Structure formats: C-alpha cells, structure tokens
Amino acid sequence: MITAAVGALKERGGSSRQAILKYIQANFKVQANPAA
C-alpha cells in the first residue's frame, strides 16, 4: 500500500507521512486510526 501511494503521488522530494496516509484512506478500505 505504501509503495503504491508513493508511486501514485509522484512528489519530487518524496511524499510526507500525512500525504501517504490520506492517499491510503482515500483509495483502500482501511479504518481511520488516529494513532497510526
């Protein structure tokens, strides 16, 4: 999931943790876990 998120975001300087989390929540069936 993480590699798919980083590949899809295509951010030049790397993807932030928040951006990866937002992408995963939007595109995969996962429960929102604020501790993650």
Curated annotation (Swiss-Prot):
Keyword list (alphabetical) reads: Chromosome, DNA-binding, Nucleus
Protein name per Swiss-Prot or TrEMBL: Histone H1-like protein EM5
- Read off the lineage from the record: Eukaryota, Metazoa, Spiralia, Lophotrochozoa, Mollusca
Q: Which residues form the H15 domain?
A: 1-36
Q: Which GO terms describe its cellular component?
A: nucleosome; nucleus
| GO terms (BP aspect) | nucleosome assembly
Family assignment from sequence similarity: Belongs to the histone H1/H5 family.
Pfam families in UniProt: Linker_histone
Q: Name one GO molecular function term.
A: DNA binding
Tissue specificity here reads: Sperm.
This protein's superkingdom?
A: Eukaryota
User: Which compartments is it annotated to reside in?
Assistant: Nucleus; Chromosome
Organism of derivation: Ensis minor (Razor shell)
Does the record carry DNA-binding as a key word? yes
